[in-house]
């Protein structure tokens, strides 16, 4: 029994040492890639188009609301030949955000009652 326990401890120690070595090897390359991706994401996040503003220049540039990303919706105004595109939130997503907000608020009340 002591032999099995000693063998198990030795096996766990070797496994943790080998996994730490592999993480060190991959760590530097992954860290550099992660930093560049974060910088790109921050640069892209600054360029989002607010709700009800023109998004015809880039239809994927709409900002995010609390839970969902707004959608670039294009339409022709009455009596006009020009297409107008604006960032809008679809109604079903608007209702889902309201429901999530109410559920979050109700969860806070329950936590307050029983917490």
Swiss-Prot record:
Expressed by the venom gland. It is found in: Secreted. InterPro entries: Spider_toxin_CSTX_knottin, Spider_toxin_CSTX_Knottin_CS. Its main location: secreted. Residues 1-20 form the signal peptide. Keywords: Disulfide bond, Knottin, Secreted, Signal, Toxin. GO terms for cellular component: extracellular region. It comes from the Eukaryota. This is U3-lycotoxin-Ls1k. It comes from Lycosa singoriensis (Wolf spider).
